[in-house]
Amino acid sequence: MILKLMAGILLLTVCLEGCSSQHWSYGLRPGGKRNTEHLVESFQEMGKEVDQMAEPQHFECTVHWPRSPLRDLRGALESLIEEEARQKKM
């Protein structure tokens, strides 16, 4: 009972903390008001970020995984099942 109560209080605290926080970016001030002196600069920054996101990014996997023994076992079982199915058809 005490464990459930503590977990509930912890969950409530985390939720309230997340809901009460405010994200400020691109010249926003408390209350959602923009700094009008730097408004053009804010939009230019946003435009640059959008252009950067539009460029495709290519990633290559450089990790070579060793051959899994489970994969070999699966292949052997599949071939046995196929062979038995062919023998039953004959």
UniProtKB/Swiss-Prot annotation:
UniProt function note: Stimulates the secretion of gonadotropins; it stimulates the secretion of both luteinizing and follicle-stimulating hormones.
Site annotation Appears to be essential for biological activity: residues: 24
Chief location bin: secreted
Pfam families: GnRH
Protein name according to UniProt: Progonadoliberin-1
Gene Ontology CC terms, in alphabetical order: axon terminus; cytoplasmic side of rough endoplasmic reticulum membrane; dendrite; extracellular space; Golgi-associated vesicle; neurosecretory vesicle; perikaryon
GO molecular function, one term: gonadotropin hormone-releasing hormone activity
Family designation: Belongs to the GnRH family.
InterPro entries on file: GnRH, Gonadoliberin, Gonadoliberin_I_precursor
Site (Cleavage): 24-29, 31-32
Entry keywords, A to Z: Amidation, Cleavage on pair of basic residues, Hormone, Pyrrolidone carboxylic acid, Secreted, Signal
Modified residues (Pyrrolidone carboxylic acid): 22
Coiled coil stretches, renumbered: none
One of the GO BP terms on file: response to lipopolysaccharide
Residues annotated with Glycine amide modification: 31
Record lineage: Eukaryota, Metazoa, Chordata, Craniata, Vertebrata
